[in-house]
Amino acid sequence: ELAERETLYATRFDGNYAYLVTFLQVDPLFIVDLRDNSNPTLLSELIVPGWSEYLEVMDDQLFAVGVENSQVTASLFDISDKSNPFLSQRFYMGDENEYSWSEANYDEKAIGKVASEGLFFIPYQTWAEGNQLNKLQILKHENGRLEKGGQIDHRIVARRSFTDATGHYLFSISGEELVVSNILDTNNAFEVRRLPLAWTTERTHIFGVNSLQIENAPTNNW
């Protein structure tokens, strides 16, 4: 037993090792040696604020998505020394001290990634000056560092994202629309096309062979 009364939030198995995150008031990251699977050995326990829900091993580093102080986080841990891991970087989604939320914190399919390019796409919701904002944050892992790139705006929260074969275009989908963005320069991504997929209609008026549909303003619903 690793952490009595704590909740297991994330687990990642990688070769001879297992990486586990639990949470009660702080976020312990455990590294367990599985080479003797009849007697797993706890190698280390790292205490950091918040907790992680998604883990991805990248050589001697561990990428994590989680929450700290009601903000979505993207973190990078150095795990080159399994007995002494440490948090090397942490980014927050949205403005400082502003609440944010992400489907990625309970469904890993919400996180888009291109492993060969070190790209991650994190959807999140936040608020600024009383307005709800829906964003897709681009993150790039390069030369052992995590860099925060540009953002893609959505009318309602983006749920899935993927790139084309060239890696130059990002397709992000919400319950309402498909947004196509050019991400050749990840720091200066820009929208190329926005296509409606579904919408809520309040009233429909028929004029001969034409119809006028009046829709609601976007909400935070799927």
Give names to the regions the model predicted:
Residues E1-W222:
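Feature marking well-ordered beta-strand scaffolds used for ligand recognition
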